[in-house]
Amino acid sequence: MTNIHPTAIIEPGAKIGKNVVIEPYVVIKSTVTLCDDVVVKSYAYIDGHTTIGKGTTIWPSAMIGNKPQDLKYQGEKTYVTIGENCEIREFAIITSSTFEGTTVSIGNNCLIMPWAHVAHNCTIGNYVILSNHAQLAGHVVVEDYAIIGGMVGVHQFVRIGAHAMVGALSGIRRDVPPYTIGTGNPYQLGGINKVGLQRRQVPFETRLALIKVFKKVYRSEDSFSESLLEAQEEYGHIPEVQNFIHFCQNPSKRGIERGADKDALQDESVEKEGALVES
């Protein structure tokens, strides 16, 4: 049963699904759609052509779908789509897109922590975590299972690859390859996100191959492109490696991140069932 507090302001035309909870002093504008089982907590503000997926919770004072912070915007009809079972926490801001017909898209099962900012024309995959005060500029792409640490700033048009983990306080100016971990400003890749991949039950052999490919690409005396081709020949039959190589060979206009922590590259081992296995 839908439960709407009498102090909530819901404009005519807004579409409200079944079993929706709308708490005190919420504002829902006329072009918003709330799917079934959505919870909108006090003082949240939802504007624009915004669709909130089933089971998602919008926490107090979050702002979604308002005018993009882009001087190029001239009132075009643009969209925000948030998937199912997401948590949009307190004071998070998700603006609408800039160009006619474009969408800011957030996938399913994402956690957007307090004060995080998702700017115009961003695309976020499934199971993504944006930590407190993470700031995404316009046109950023964050792929599935990526984790962005607290107070990270991501430059416009950058891509963050799947399963990547970006450490807190980092400044991201170039594309971050999938499956990697890193930190710093300027950003330094620290290797493969071994713990995250293990937690997601990626097979040991795949994790080991990714570690070897990373070292081949980032430590080789050959050029970056040549190292990728060598990795393709040796490990390209593994889907995750293929994804890593394709990502690096097809960067955004920002280019691929090539800075790597020298100390991390000296670590030649990976855990398997408690034992240390040389790579």
Curated annotation (Swiss-Prot):
Keyword list, A-Z: Acyltransferase, Cytoplasm, Lipid A biosynthesis, Lipid biosynthesis, Lipid metabolism, Repeat, Transferase
Listed pathway(s): Glycolipid biosynthesis; lipid IV(A) biosynthesis; lipid IV(A) from (3R)-3-hydroxytetradecanoyl-[acyl-carrier-protein] and UDP-N-acetyl-alpha-D-glucosamine: step 1/6
Annotated GO biological process: lipid A biosynthetic process
Region (Disordered) location: 256-279
Stored SUPFAM superfamilies: Trimeric LpxA-like enzymes
Enzyme Commission no: 2.3.1.129
GO molecular function, one term: acyl-[acyl-carrier-protein]-UDP-N-acetylglucosamine O-acyltransferase activity
Main location: cytoplasm
InterPro entries assigned: Acetyltransf_C, Acetyltransf_C_sf, Hexapep, Hexapep_transf_CS, Lipid_A_LpxA, Trimer_LpxA-like_sf
General function of this protein: Involved in the biosynthesis of lipid A, a phosphorylated glycolipid that anchors the lipopolysaccharide to the outer membrane of the cell.
Similarity-based family: Belongs to the transferase hexapeptide repeat family. LpxA subfamily.
Description of how the protein assembles with itself and partners: Homotrimer.
Name used for this protein in its record: Acyl-[acyl-carrier-protein]--UDP-N-acetylglucosamine O-acyltransferase
